Amino acid sequence: MKIQLASSYGFCFGVKRAIKIAEEHQGSKTYGPLIHNKDEINRLKEGFDIGLAEKLDDVTPEDSVVIRTHGIPKDELSQLKAQENPIIDATCPYVTTPQNIVANMSEKGYSIVIFGDKEHPEIKGVVSYAKDLRNAFIVKHEDELKGLPILSKVAVVAQTTRKPEDFLKIVNALILNHKEVRVFNTICNATFENQDAAAELAKDADVMVVIGGKHSSNTKQLHSICKSYCDDSYLIENEAELEPKWFEGKKLCGISAGASTPDWIVQNVIDKIEALK
């Protein structure tokens, strides 16, 4: 069985930047998990004494606080500043872009539509920048737009890790029903590249392994894309989750990895699959 990596996979610019920031601030705490990868979080904890604050009460006066890659709600950032904790912002620049767009367009009187998962930390942060939360709407499907009190002029942004084709469905539905629609494509380039590369490989592979955190939006999107081309597509966090039966009788095993998956985990998975051959 041949093992082939997707032409684009793994750590994106924003995650690489955040990891470097954390490593340079040994002994600090991240506000929320820095990235959606438990193994890498544990590496930072063990090697660099990086702690975790899940809420404001977990932050002590002496803590230096690293803001997670996904960003945090505006009011929580303001409270951290009011507490005068040293703050190191590791929010991905691709995430601050929709934050700024939402702030700017809502100030100009536009309704805000955000395509994404309302429970995802990135989206919780982005929507908090709206001037009036009653005029900001989070949707995952175009059907959810029906009946919403959206104004005649609307600005739309996307969670950075969503599928472009799904974003277009939201945009098309808005254009059909609203006089002025301002579209801001805030999907990250790395997301495009990883998704396209995974799709191309999945077309040829007879088994696909997608590596990444189970709570990682971009990893789940990759798995969904692979599954649409290759029925035997599996999402794992590390090599311990591999099952020998997946590879029985297979000729080509494709591998992709989410944006929060470090190369050392990818290599561990490859080594384990090699051993199973």
Swiss-Prot record:
Active-site residues per Swiss-Prot or TrEMBL entry: 122
Cofactor(s) required, per the database record: [4Fe-4S] cluster
Signal peptide annotation: none
Name used for this protein in its record: 4-hydroxy-3-methylbut-2-enyl diphosphate reductase
Chain coiled-coil ranges: none
Function recorded in the entry: Catalyzes the conversion of 1-hydroxy-2-methyl-2-(E)-butenyl 4-diphosphate (HMBPP) into a mixture of isopentenyl diphosphate (IPP) and dimethylallyl diphosphate (DMAPP). Acts in the terminal step of the DOXP/MEP pathway for isoprenoid precursor biosynthesis.
Binding site for (2E)-4-hydroxy-3-methylbut-2-enyl diphosphate: 36, 70, 120, 160, 216-218, 260
Cofactor stoichiometry and binding remark: Binds 1 [4Fe-4S] cluster per subunit.
Keyword field contains 4Fe-4S: yes
Pathway: Isoprenoid biosynthesis; dimethylallyl diphosphate biosynthesis; dimethylallyl diphosphate from (2E)-4-hydroxy-3-methylbutenyl diphosphate: step 1/1; Isoprenoid biosynthesis; isopentenyl diphosphate biosynthesis via DXP pathway; isopentenyl diphosphate from 1-deoxy-D-xylulose 5-phosphate: step 6/6
Annotated binding of isopentenyl diphosphate, by residue: 36, 70, 120, 216-218, 260
Gene Ontology BP term (one): isopentenyl diphosphate biosynthetic process, methylerythritol 4-phosphate pathway
Taxonomic source organism: Sulfurovum sp. (strain NBC37-1)
EC class of the enzyme, as a word: oxidoreductase
Binding site residues for dimethylallyl diphosphate: 36, 70, 120, 216-218, 260
Record-level Gene Ontology MF annotations: 4 iron, 4 sulfur cluster binding; 4-hydroxy-3-methylbut-2-enyl diphosphate reductase activity; metal ion binding
Family: Belongs to the IspH family.
Xref: HAMAP family: IspH
Binding positions ([4Fe-4S] cluster): 12, 92, 188
EC number: 1.17.7.4
Keywords: 4Fe-4S, Iron, Iron-sulfur, Isoprene biosynthesis, Metal-binding, Oxidoreductase
Catalytic activity, reaction form: isopentenyl diphosphate + 2 oxidized [2Fe-2S]-[ferredoxin] + H2O = (2E)-4-hydroxy-3-methylbut-2-enyl diphosphate + 2 reduced [2Fe-2S]-[ferredoxin] + 2 H(+); dimethylallyl diphosphate + 2 oxidized [2Fe-2S]-[ferredoxin] + H2O = (2E)-4-hydroxy-3-methylbut-2-enyl diphosphate + 2 reduced [2Fe-2S]-[ferredoxin] + 2 H(+)
